[in-house]
Amino acid sequence: MIRRNPNGDLPAIHSNAFIDPTAIICGKVIVDRHVFIGPYAVIRADETDDHGNLHPIHIGEGTNIQDGVVMHSKDGGPISIGKHTSIAHRAIVHGPCQVGDRVFVGFNSVLFNCTIGDGCAIRHNAVIDGMTLPANFYIPSTSRIGPDTDITAFSESVSDTNLQLVQGYKRIQNEL
C-alpha cells in the first residue's frame, strides 16, 4: 500500500522497483531502481521534528528489503540505505541511520541512531545503537554494540576467534 503521510508527502518509487502489495510505504520515501521490498515490510517517513521538518527515507539502487522489515525515523531524522544492500527478515532500522553500500543486516537485527560503513556484515539478532561502524566491519550474531562498546577490542576478539576456528578446522581438515 502506497500512501501519503499527514504532511501530504507521497513516496517516490522508481518504475523498475518491486513493492510487494502487502508492504506499506508511507510518506517521504525515495525508492531507487531495481529495489525489492518484500511482503509486510513497513517503511514510514511521517514523523516531523519540533520545527515541522521531515527528512526522507532513501533506499538505494539494487537494495533488497525483505519480509517484515520496519523502517521508521524518530523526529523526522534521515534514513539512507546504500546501493546493493540487504536488510533481512524482520530487521528494524530506526532513524536517524545511514547504512552504506553492499551491507548485510541479518534477520531480527536492530539499527538505531547509527552509521554503518560500506561492506559491513551485521549478523542475525544483533543490536547497533548509537554507533559508527567503519567500512567492512563484521558483527557476529546476537551482539549488542552501543556507545560504551570499544569496537577496536571487539574487532580484535572477532579476529582472534576467527583465527582459532581456521586453525582448528585446518587441523581436522582431512577428517571432514
Predicted regions and their residues:
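N-terminal segments that cap or nucleate solenoid repeat domains
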Residues: 1-40
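Glycine-rich hexapeptide-repeat left-handed beta-helix
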Residues: 2-12, 40, 44-46, 50-56, ...
